[in-house]
C-alpha cells in the first residue's frame, strides 16, 4: 500500500486502474496529499510491479481474474481509517472508480469520487448512501456516458458530470490526457471534497 501521511484530520483512499500503482496514480496521490489529506492507496493487484499501458490486455485479464469488483478489502480499510480520521473519502480511477461506486452503497465512507468508471453501467442499481461524484469522459468506446447519466439521474446524493475527453483524460502519462478538461475535473473533485470535510 502506498501511504502519504502528515497527521491530517481527513483521509482519502485512492483506488487505482487495472495497471496498478503507476506514475499517474502516484501523481494523483501526491496532489490530494498536498491539499491536506492523508492518503492510502491499496495495491489491489498484489504484485511486485505495475503494468505498462502497452500491456492493457494483460492488465485487464489479470484484474478480471485476480481482483474483480469485490469491495471487502476497501470496506475494511474504510472501517480502520474511520477510527482515526474525521472523514474518509474514496477516489477511484477506471476500475477503481467502479469499485468506489460500489462502495458508495456498502461502505461507511463519507464521500466518493469516481473518475471514468466504465463498469458502473453494470451496477446501475447501486444506491449511494454518501455524497457521490461521478466524472465521465464523453468519448467512451464501449458505451454512451449520456445514456448512463440518464439511467442514474434519479439517484439521491449523486452528481454526474461528462467531460469533453476520452477515457483517462486526467492521466498526464496517457495519450488520452486532456489538460484543460483534467483541470476542470480536478477542480470539481476538490470543490466536492471540500464541502464534505467542511
Which role does the model predict for each range below?
Residues 82-93:
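Alpha/beta-hydrolase fold nucleophile elbow
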Residues 128, 134-136:
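Short beta-strand/loop motif that positions the catalytic acidic residue
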Residues 158-198:
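C-terminal catalytic histidine-bearing segment of alpha/beta-hydrolase fold enzymes
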Residues 27-28, 143-152:
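Short alpha-helix in the alpha/beta-hydrolase fold that links the catalytic acid
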Residues 108-118:
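A conserved short beta-strand
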Residues 1-83, 171:
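Serine-hydrolase catalytic machinery in alpha/beta-hydrolase-like enzymes
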Residues 102-106:
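Active-site signature of alpha/beta-hydrolase-fold catalytic machinery across serine-
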Residues 92-96, 100:
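Gly/Ala-rich beta-loop-alpha elbow adjacent to hydrolase catalytic centers
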Amino acid at each position: 500500500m502506498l501511504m502519504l501521511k502528515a497527521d491530517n484530520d481527513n483521509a482519502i483512499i485512492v483506488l487505482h486502474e487495472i495497471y496498478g500503482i503507476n506514475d499517474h496514480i502516484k501523481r494523483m496521490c501526491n496532489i490530494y496529499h498536498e491539499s491536506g489529506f492523508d492518503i492510502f492507496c491499496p495495491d489491489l493487484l498484489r504484485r511486485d510491479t505495475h503494468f505498462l499501458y502497452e500491456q492493457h490486455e494483460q492488465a485487464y485479464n489479470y484484474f478480471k481474474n485476480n481482483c474483480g469488483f469485490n469491495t471487502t478489502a476497501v470496506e475494511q480499510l474504510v472501517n480502520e481509517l474511520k477510527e482515526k480520521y474525521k472523514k474518509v473519502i474514496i477516489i477511484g480511477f477506471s476500475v477503481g472508480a467502479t469499485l468506489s461506486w460500489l462502495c458508495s452503497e456498502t461502505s461507511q465512507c463519507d464521500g466518493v469520487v469516481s473518475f471514468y468508471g466504465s463498469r458502473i453501467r453494470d451496477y446501475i442499481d447501486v444506491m449511494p448512501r454518501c455524497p457521490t461524484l461521478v466524472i465521465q469522459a464523453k468519448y467512451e468506446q464501449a458505451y454512451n456516458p449520456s445514456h448512463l447519466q440518464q439511467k442514474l439521474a434519479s439517484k439521491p446524493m449523486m452528481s454526474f458530470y461528462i467531460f469533453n475527453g476520452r477515457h483517462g483524460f486526467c492521466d498526464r502519462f496517457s495519450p488520452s490526457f486532456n489538460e484543460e478538461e483534467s483541470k476542470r475535473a480536478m477542480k470539481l473533485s476538490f470543490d466536492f471534497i471540500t464541502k464534505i470535510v467542511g
